[in-house]
Amino acid sequence: MSERIAVIGSGAFGTALAAVIALAGRSPVILVGRNPSLVADLKAERLHDAVLPGIALPESLEFSAEAEAIAGASIVLFAMPSQAQADAARQYGPYLSKDAVVVTCAKGIERTTGNLLTDMLERELPDHPVAVLSGPGFAADIAKGLPTAMAIAAADMETAERLAQAISGRTFRLYASDDRIGVQLGGALKNVLAIACGIVEGRGIGESARAALIARGLAEMSRFVVAKGGQADTVRGLSGLGDLVLTGTSHQSRNLRFGIALGRGEKADPLQGALVEGALAASVASRLAAALSISMPITDAVSAIIDGRLEIADAIEQLMTRPITTE
């Protein structure tokens, strides 16, 4: 089946995805942005130095600032931040082809409702199947053609495999899944845990503490995913463990850098500057966990630190003096 692919969102991740799919050469790809001036520059210069400095964009990649440019696309990737996806669905929904599959590429939870992004998009776009792409992949690595593997999940395996085949390339490999819950929650919760890893680094309390956070954070993630109807095996895969290791250790991670700033005692506003998905997801995840009676002490601590309800020193003491239990 011949596919036509549209990527909405001309930030770093959307541009990188559009570029790597275009380089694969199997499907025509168009990158759709909201800023006509930026789109004109991308088309003329084949560079996006503001977010991907020095990386040339393929000549085969098309560009547009018009919403109707997605008409005719059989696969449409939503690559804007999580909290902007509902508005994007309303803006671009009228131009979707009848049989188009929508793929959310954000890693977050809808802040006002606590819904997963696939649930929100199905509510906004009820006539279209919705999938999710997530996992350990930085935009710069993808755009540079460095080997990257991620997960793509749909409601059925047939659709997931079709999407994986259409989007994968020589340096960008997707693994198909039918666990949309697990893939999405892994992507959202690892951002919160990456902030915790950053706090550890900024505070200077050692790599042993970071390793403990990753391991115990993964246990929290697994409890939450299973309680929400996802699969524990997904948590141990690319969208869970893989993404957590990447964002909890690499300074390319906005969430890690945000945590480092907190750990150093710097004032860091998650709503200013670089968008930090984990800062937005922490309170939502903590609230949902409490409603489900799930123990998530690391997530709770991160939420309380960001909200100013808990000092870092007190959070560390609370975590280290919890009742002894089995692993």
Curated annotation (Swiss-Prot):
Keywords: Cytoplasm, Lipid biosynthesis, Lipid metabolism, NAD, NADP, Nucleotide-binding, Oxidoreductase, Phospholipid biosynthesis, Phospholipid metabolism. Sn-glycerol 3-phosphate binds at K107, G135, K190, D243, S253, R254, N255. Its EC number is 1.1.1.94. It is found in: Cytoplasm. The active site is at K190 (proton acceptor). Gene3D superfamilies: N-(1-d-carboxylethyl)-l-norvaline Dehydrogenase, domain 2, NAD(P)-binding Rossmann-like Domain. Pfam families: NAD_Gly3P_dh_C (PF07479), NAD_Gly3P_dh_N (PF01210). GO terms for biological process: carbohydrate metabolic process; glycerol-3-phosphate biosynthetic process; glycerol-3-phosphate catabolic process; glycerophospholipid metabolic process; phospholipid biosynthetic process. One of its GO terms (molecular function) is glycerol-3-phosphate dehydrogenase [NAD(P)+] activity. The keyword Cell division does not apply. NADPH binds at F13, R34, K107, A139, R254, V276, E277. Pathway: Membrane lipid metabolism; glycerophospholipid metabolism. It is an enzyme of class 1 (oxidoreductase). The keyword NAD applies. It catalyses: sn-glycerol 3-phosphate + NAD(+) = dihydroxyacetone phosphate + NADH + H(+); sn-glycerol 3-phosphate + NADP(+) = dihydroxyacetone phosphate + NADPH + H(+). InterPro entries: 6-PGluconate_DH-like_C_sf, 6PGD_dom2, G3P_DH_NAD-dep, G3P_DH_NAD-dep_C, G3P_DH_NAD-dep_N, NAD(P)-bd_dom_sf. Its main location: cytoplasm. One of its GO terms (cellular component) is cytosol. Belongs to the NAD-dependent glycerol-3-phosphate dehydrogenase family. Catalyzes the reduction of the glycolytic intermediate dihydroxyacetone phosphate (DHAP) to sn-glycerol 3-phosphate (G3P), the key precursor for phospholipid synthesis. This is Glycerol-3-phosphate dehydrogenase [NAD(P)+].
